[in-house]
Design a protein with these regions (language model features):
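Substrate-binding pocket helix/loop in short-chain dehydrogenase/reductase
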Residues: 102-103, 107-115, 205, 209
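Active-site helix of classical SDR
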Residues: 126, 160, 168
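A glycine/serine/threonine-rich, flexible loop-to-helix segment
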Residues: 177, 189-213
């Protein structure tokens, strides 16, 4: 059986790092991306390799679609050199940023940055990577609980996640002919450094979230 390979964007920290480590623990090889902290990515690669699987890291700015052709070429090169393959099996579109700003105060620049990273980026990155994704492969996109309920200060961020949910349904329909399944997960609040560690480090935000949670945890 061919060894499975997962490409995890934003895999050097937070949810992406955790996902990469969990996949590696189940025997999946990992190709992860990082935005700027190469050392953090290499540390994750080393941690993954200790689990007995292969791993590699590539730089990627998900917010700059002009770099995607070059990135796809890099992926193809790494697949050939490290795995002797022309395709990978799983794509996790995880990389992203957060924004806490009231609707009335959200700037066009903030909106555009979110759009580029949270929606346009995954849209066109996935498109560019389709020739490298194995038939019968899997794509997993990431939404948020904020697309299910309204929490003041997250209008722009939640709108992008809502867009990703619609996109996921269309991808599933259009890629099904290749046996590729496309799904999306919508995590709740997680204590990572995402969004500057707002959930983890801001006591007021923590209390507010706990107040909305059944067990208050």
């Amino acid at each position: 059986m061919t060894q499975r390979i997962a490409l995890v964007t934003g895999g050097s920290r937070g949810l992406g790092k955790n996902a990469a480590l969990k996949l590696a623990a189940k025997g999946t090889d990992i190709l992860l991306t990082y935005h700027s902290n190469r050392q953090a990515a290499l540390d994750v690669v080393a941690e993954i390799e200790k689990k007995g699987v292969k791993a590699a890291a590539l730089a990627l700015n998900v917010g700059d679609s002009t770099t995607f052709d070059a990135f796809a070429s890099e992926v193809a090169q790494v697949l050939a050199q490290k795995w002797g393959r022309t395709t990978f099996d799983y794509l996790l579109n995880n990389a992203g940023i957060g924004l806490n700003a009231p609707f009335a105060e959200t700037s066009e620049a903030q909106f555009d940055e979110l759009m580029n990273i949270q929606f346009k980026g995954p849209f066109f990155l996935t498109q560019r990577l389709l020739p490298l994704l194995q038939d019968g492969g899997r794509i997993l996109n990431v939404s948020s609980g904020l697309a299910r309920f309204a929490l003041p200060g997250y209008a722009a961020y939640a709108a992008m996640k809502g867009a990703m949910e619609v996109l996921t349904r269309y991808q599933a329909k259009e890629l099904g002919g290749r046996g590729i399944s496309v799904n999306i997960i919508a995590p709740g609040a997680i204590e990572t450094d995402f969004g500057g560690g707002e959930v983890r480090d801001n006591a007021e935000v923590n209390r507010h979230i706990a107040a909305q949670t059944a067990l208050g945890l």
